[in-house]
Structures are given as C-alpha cells and as structure tokens.
Amino acid sequence: MNQEVIAKRYASALFQIALEQQQLDQIEEDIRAVRQALAENGEFLSLLSNPKLSLDKKKALVREAFAGVSAPVQHTLLLLLERHRFGIVPELAEQFIALANDARGIAEAVAYSARPLTDEELQALSDVFAKKVGKETLRIENIVDPELIGGVKLRIGNRIYDGSVSGQLERIQRQLIS
C-alpha cells in the first residue's frame, strides 16, 4: 500500500482522537514538534530502522525523545514503531496538519518577498486571499527572496499568485513578443 495512503489513515485516526478529547491545538503543536525534531535529526530515523536494536530499546528511545508530547501522539509513535512504519511520521504530520487546517478553515501559504513582511501586511494578504481560496484565514510563512525586485509572490497549495515586479516584467515581455 502507498505510504501516503497509510499515513493518511493514521493521521485521520489521530485527528478523530484529537477531536474526541478536545485536544486539537495541543496535538497539532506536538505533531509539528515531532516533525521538526525528525527533520533536524535524520540519524534518529536511521537508528530506529536498525535491525540490531531491539524493539524495547527503540520504544525506550522514542519515549525518552518525545517525553513532552501528549499521550495520543506518543501512543501513535509507539504503534508506528511496532508496525515498522515509523518512517511515515513526517507524512503523517503533513496529513494531520492538513486535516486540522481544513477543520478550522485555514490554508497554509508561503509569501515570497524582497524584504520581510510586517504582521499587518501578512494579515492583509490573508484577508484578501483567504476568500479567494474559500478559507477563513491563511497561515502565511514569509520567505525573503533576494531575486525579487519588489512585490509579493504567494503560494497557496499548488496555486501561485504572482504580484512581484519581476513577474509583471515577464508578463509584459511575453505580451510584447507575441
């Protein structure tokens, strides 16, 4: 079975538990922390896939490494470890965050700009573009792109809204050529 499908099933189960226990915010925060910890420590995943290490030792490592996370997240991690599917944790995190965002009417977005955007500018972008994608609000990550002359390029899911000066110049160039 496809890893993405498997991750989505585990994410859905964890999401249902989060809703039932009214811990959606806490579990989302924990799952983001787990995802970040695994991204920063790639050796940890390699260690857990080592066949020479017993399952009990692997469980002890996971309990110790993620002692601060909520019980549902820790139980999910241990279950994945038992079923030799710990490698899907990053994908599970992505799927869980998508489910949580969907439930709240939030979309993830990335804003590329020539300089860091202020909170007011990010809020203005969120207000305008959230309506365009049918969401209540956007959670925007701002990335400074020195190649942009000015303006903003916004990516929401697989759509890109290009309001950058360089993007406008490219469109003008295409119009002049054709």
From Swiss-Prot:
Keyword Ion transport: yes
GO MF: proton-transporting ATP synthase activity, rotational mechanism
Topological category with respect to the lipid bilayer: Peripheral membrane protein
Pfam families: OSCP
Transport listed as a keyword: yes
Subcellular location(s) per record: Cell membrane
Keyword set, alphabetical order: ATP synthesis, Cell membrane, CF(1), Hydrogen ion transport, Ion transport, Membrane, Transport
Listed transmembrane segments: none
Quaternary structure annotation from Swiss-Prot or TrEMBL: F-type ATPases have 2 components, F(1) - the catalytic core - and F(0) - the membrane proton channel. F(1) has five subunits: alpha(3), beta(3), gamma(1), delta(1), epsilon(1). F(0) has three main subunits: a(1), b(2) and c(10-14). The alpha and beta chains form an alternating ring which encloses part of the gamma chain. F(1) is attached to F(0) by a central stalk formed by the gamma and epsilon chains, while a peripheral stalk is formed by the delta and b chains.
Protein's job: F(1)F(0) ATP synthase produces ATP from ADP in the presence of a proton or sodium gradient. F-type ATPases consist of two structural domains, F(1) containing the extramembraneous catalytic core and F(0) containing the membrane proton channel, linked together by a central stalk and a peripheral stalk. During catalysis, ATP synthesis in the catalytic domain of F(1) is coupled via a rotary mechanism of the central stalk subunits to proton translocation.
The protein, known as: ATP synthase subunit delta
Gene: atpH
